[in-house]
Amino acid sequence: MTTSSHGTAPFLPGEHGELLQALAEQRTLLLITVRDITDAQAAQRTTVSELTLGGIVKHLTRCEQVWTQIMVKGEGELPEGMLDLEQYRMVEGETLAGLLEQYTAAAQGTEESVAALPDLGRSVPLPKTPWSPPETVHWSARRILLHVIRETAQHGGHADIIREALDGASTTAQR
């Protein structure tokens, strides 16, 4: 199985492949959005939001790592760092290139883990979080993957707004 740094998922037949391809397409749009920016630009706030382009890449990396771990382990345990607010911002010493390398590695890990799952209908208990109901909630592996796709698409839209405010570029104008 191979994955390019441009967000192309490996070919897998059926639902596994279709969902991974949808995720890869959203990753590709994010990579277009952050193309040709400096580390300083990646760390710069351009709206009243705390979000930055680098922070979005960092968060989506952590998002894939955490949700893949939840999906694969299926233990309902809160992964270390899931609630860490540092995942939303670039810190001193981080570079966009380094964050993108980590994002590519997380993407490959997601793809390998999903490809190895025999059943996307597998029920997984979600970890307890401050926003979850008191009872244990279960999602299918499929729903977890759909959540990762939604997170990537939603934050990709945020990234596009931040980029346009930064230098006038947008994802569609760069294609």
Place the predicted regions along the sequence by residue.
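Short, contiguous alpha-helical
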Residues: T2-A9, H16, L20-R35, D39-E86, ...
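Acidic/histidine-rich alpha-helical segments that form the ligand environment
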Residues: Y88-P127, S140-A153
